[in-house]
Each structure stands twice: as C-alpha cells, then as structure tokens.
Amino acid sequence: MATSAAVKDEPATQFAKDQLKAIIERIERLEEEKKTISDDIRDVYAEAKGNGYDVKALRTIVRMRKQDADERAEQETILETYLQALGML
C-alpha cells in the first residue's frame, strides 16, 4: 500500500501538480491582463468625457455595435412600441 509520501513522488502526480499550477498561473496572468484592459477602457471613456462626449451614449453605441442587425432592429422596434404606449413619442 502506498503511503501519502510515496504518492507525492509519483511522476503522474507530479505531472498533475505541475499542470494544475500552470493552469492557475495562466488564469492569474489573464485576470491581470483583463484588469489592465478594463483600466484602459475606463481611461478612454474618461478621455471622451473630457472631450465633451456623453459616455452613456458611447457605451450604448458600443453595446449596439456588438449586436447583429436583426437583433438591434428588434430591440429598437420594441423600444419604440413601449415609448409610444407611454405617450413619449
């Protein structure tokens, strides 16, 4: 019967440990990159605001550009319907 000390030294176990460590380190590195990118995006929005642009409108445009044309048209139709129902158009 293998002891826990013997299991620690088995090549397959060491490989699994190394692989797990590599995965964790990759995730940590990507999380740091994600934070850096988020900071950069925040800086661009701050720059836009400083130049007089409406940040809320910019965020809406960025979100809309991610949608395909059909999805965007459907949402615009729904919004227009709701605005008409509320007497806002």
Curated annotation (Swiss-Prot):
Pfam families found in the cross-reference section: GapR_DNA-bd
Cited HAMAP family: UPF0335
InterPro entries attached to this UniProt entry: GapR-like, GapR-like_DNA-bd
Entry superkingdom: Bacteria
Organism ancestry: Bacteria, Pseudomonadati, Pseudomonadota, Alphaproteobacteria, Hyphomicrobiales
Protein name: UPF0335 protein RPE_4107
Organism: Rhodopseudomonas palustris (strain BisA53)
Molecular function GO terms recorded: DNA binding
Family: Belongs to the UPF0335 family.
